[in-house]
Amino acid sequence: MSLLDTLQRGLADLDAQGLRRVRRIAYTACDAHMTVNGREIVGFASNDYLGLAAHPALVAAFAEGAQRYGSGSGGSHLLGGHSRAHARLEDELAGFAGGFSDAPRALYFSTGYMANLAAMTALAGKGATIFSDALNHASLIDGMRLSRANVQVYPHADTAALAALLDASAAETKLIVSDTVFSMDGDIAPLTELVALAERHGAWLVVDDAHGFGVLGPQGRGALAAAALRSPHLVYVGTLGKAAGVAGAFVIAHETVIEWLIQRARSYIFTTAAPPAVAHAVSASLKVIAGDEGDARRAHLAALIERTRALLRNTRWQPVDSHTAVQPLVIGSNDATLAAMRALDAHGLWVPAIRPPTVPAGTSRLRVSLSAAHSFDDLARLEAALIEASEAAAASVGAARQEAAA
């Protein structure tokens, strides 16, 4: 069988299981109201939590950065591509989100995936043991696999199980690794307990705050700041394409850790640096996030979250108990979840269907992603469409059962 035959068979299998992904094309800027596939829609799909992706100040900064630094960096960070914009941003990030450390330093990456690969592969290797939450992001998991470290997975957020694994470990280097906000459930890791376990067992704690940075904590400084946590053995990863509204990611840690990443992190060394204009725009984003406007946007988002929690309980499906901008609604089967997504699409609402392998089999769900750009009128439209779709689904199931029993 040829490679193409094998791939065609694989695609057919995905179709049969309701697992093939399809891209949609956005014709306008990322916002609550967009033109997608030629239609006007209200989007509940993006991670633009503060509604900054189309913010005029960020757009202007991006254009200014391009005028000043050009359209590309021209090389890797170690071979000519590290601009003043990158260096300034790293200093700003360390000052903004590095309050957990006495000697914080930041390192900017082109993507969150690359930042997580760097942290896993450069800080752990043969002889090290990584203790990983069962629901960690795929980029962390891939980094662990590449690290060649021993990996022990503990049940989601189960600190007792983690403590038992740490007690039994004789590894010289131990890394506890966890998302802060879990991207498909919206719950927050038990960070206080994780820090305590790390310190008790001489381990380091690596946290991925992709969905918390900019939203959680005072001035949006992140999940560690929200929990008022400090420790010399913390490594903090954040992303800049979600709440920050631009692109890229960063690692903040003790300056020695960051210097080691510069020397040994392959996903930092062997890639072209992001355009300086991107870093310039992120600097503008940090000013908005930390200012009065950022506070107002976070307050509005918090109100939207509480309203959404209430409206999801009015459907026939199972909401996940989330207090973050990620509001999942578990339906179960792939086909039923896709049908629900299509029903919402007919109402001009884009709510993505999340299916395996992103979530466990049998827990396919709609993932409602909220933004400060949404209005309460947008939520009213969502509620009406969800109730209609869930009632129709329940009626269809009931009719099928009656037919089977006849």
UniProtKB/Swiss-Prot annotation:
InterPro entries under this entry?
Answer: Aminotransferase_I/II_large, AON_synthase_class-II, AONS_Archaea/Proteobacteria, AONS_Proteobacteria, PyrdxlP-dep_Trfase, PyrdxlP-dep_Trfase_major, PyrdxlP-dep_Trfase_small
Disulfide bond annotation, renumbered to this chain: none
Q: Catalytic activity, per the record?
A: 6-carboxyhexanoyl-[ACP] + L-alanine + H(+) = (8S)-8-amino-7-oxononanoate + holo-[ACP] + CO2
As cofactor, the record names:
pyridoxal 5'-phosphate
Name the Enzyme Commission number(s) assigned to this protein: 2.3.1.47
Q: Which UniProt keywords apply?
A: Biotin biosynthesis, Pyridoxal phosphate, Transferase
One of this protein's GO BP terms? Answer: biotin biosynthetic process
Q: What class of enzyme is it?
A: transferase
One of the record's GO molecular function terms: pyridoxal phosphate binding
**Which Pfam families does this entry report, sorted A to Z?**
Aminotran_1_2 (PF00155)
| Keyword check for Membrane | no
Give the record's pathway.
Answer: Cofactor biosynthesis; biotin biosynthesis
The UniProt record gives the binding positions of substrate as: 21, 137, 358
Q: Which residues carry this modification: N6-(pyridoxal phosphate)lysine?
A: 242
Query: Could you list the residue ranges that cross the membrane?
Result: none
Q: Which domain of life is it from?
A: Bacteria
Sequence positions that bind pyridoxal 5'-phosphate: 112-113, 183, 211, 239
Assembly information from the UniProt record: Homodimer.
Purpose of the protein: Catalyzes the decarboxylative condensation of pimeloyl-[acyl-carrier protein] and L-alanine to produce 8-amino-7-oxononanoate (AON), [acyl-carrier protein], and carbon dioxide.
Write out the similarity annotation. Answer: Belongs to the class-II pyridoxal-phosphate-dependent aminotransferase family. BioF subfamily.
UniProt-recorded name of the protein: 8-amino-7-oxononanoate synthase
Which species expresses this protein natively? Burkholderia orbicola (strain MC0-3)
Q: What is the lineage of its organism?
A: Bacteria, Pseudomonadati, Pseudomonadota, Betaproteobacteria, Burkholderiales
